[in-house]
């Protein structure tokens, strides 16, 4: 189906405390939808210059968690944030089997074509970094630079990291989480909780369990592990239904390590020194991708651009300059 673009304009006022360095005080947004082969993909654009598309994690989150932290990049680049299929403001699908990395690669390509981006830069964070790797394997000729943030090239290796994260928990927390997981994580609690994690599990797993690996230096004061902003049907299909510390949905097929050497474009890999996606994973990608650059941010968890916003922005600008 022909890719169609529907747009509107609005203005977003920036936070005065976004960064200590000077930046524009008003960020103009173009927003709209691209019909990506029958699936409506939401996007937002800021700035002008060479295009930099940014893809989020989850899977099943949205681009919102990047804002306002990445907005200073619009001084030099045309930023394109998308919500992946089934996420954020993009279209939810009845057939959950359509939630795959491969289909999302085609969505990214459809947005690139529809917006006339030509050869673009691509940044992926967390699961978005998995998507960015997959896009590079298929459409490398359409990329100028690749930026892989706090991500992993292998689900089996990521699952080994989760084992270590659990081992480092207090015995009491680990026992609580294991008990909830063994009883099944869905179909419990109040009616509105039965198709997602209960608040009790989210607070234990995302709050107590993950928090030290999300933030180190500068925790987001609004972080709420019980907030319900996910696309749960997508999450269960891709991540799985057996908890936060094992990926056993369709993402279990992600094993890219032996293909990383085929990425020949300039590539930046970064993560936090206490990242949920352990630095060893970024070091492996750096070793396998020829000529790649590696930055490990100090005093930083998974949300590197929150913990170290100035360092993060500078590293991206230096790499793309």
Give each language-model segment a name.
Residues 292-321:
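Catalytic active-site module of serine/aspartate enzymes centered on a nucleophile-bearing elbow/loop
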Residues 179-258, 265:
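Alpha/beta-hydrolase
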Residues 147-191:
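Flexible "cap/lid" loop of the alpha/beta hydrolase fold
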Residues 39-92:
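Conserved HGGG/HGGXW glycine-rich cap/lid loop of the alpha/beta-hydrolase fold
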Residues 84-127:
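Active-site loop/oxyanion-hole signature of alpha/beta-hydrolase fold enzymes
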Residues 276-281:
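Conserved alpha/beta-hydrolase "acid-adjacent" motif
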Residues 263, 269-271:
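Short beta-strand/loop motif that positions the catalytic acidic residue
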Residues 118-161:
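Conserved hydrolase catalytic core segment
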